[in-house]
Amino acid sequence: MKTSKMICAFLLVLVVGTFNDISGAYGEYVEDQHSFKIERRFPPCVEVCVQHTGNVKECEAACGE
C-alpha cells in the first residue's frame, strides 16, 4: 500500500511539473508572437519604399499618398 501511494505521489508531481513546463513554454510562445507584430505607420506602398530608401517624403510622392 505504501508503494502505491508513493507511485501516485510521484505521478502527480510528474504531471504537475510537465503541465508547468508546457504552460510556461506556451506563454513564451505567445509573447514571441506578439513581439513580431509590426505597427504600420504608413500605407503598405510607403512602408516598403521607406524600408528601402529611408526617405518618407520621396516615398509618399512616389506612391501618390
UniProtKB/Swiss-Prot annotation:
Residue ranges that the Swiss-Prot or TrEMBL entry lists as coiled coil: none
Stretch forming the signal peptide: 1-27
Expression sites by tissue: Expressed by the venom gland.
Subcellular location field: Secreted
Cysteine-cysteine disulfides: 45-63, 49-59
Domain of life of the organism encoding this protein: Eukaryota
Gene Ontology CC terms: extracellular region
Main location: secreted
Residue ranges the record assigns to the propeptide: 28-39
GO molecular function: potassium channel regulator activity; toxin activity
Swiss-Prot/TrEMBL keywords: Cleavage on pair of basic residues, Disulfide bond, Ion channel impairing toxin, Neurotoxin, Potassium channel impairing toxin, Secreted, Signal, Toxin, Voltage-gated potassium channel impairing toxin
Family to which this protein belongs: Belongs to the short scorpion toxin superfamily. Potassium channel inhibitor kappa-KTx family. Kappa-KTx 2 subfamily.
Domain notes: Has the structural arrangement of two alpha-helices stabilized by disulfide bonds (CSalpha/alpha 2(S-S)).
Function of the protein: Potassium channel inhibitor (Kv).
Record protein name field: Potassium channel toxin kappa-KTx 2.6
Species for this entry: Opisthacanthus cayaporum
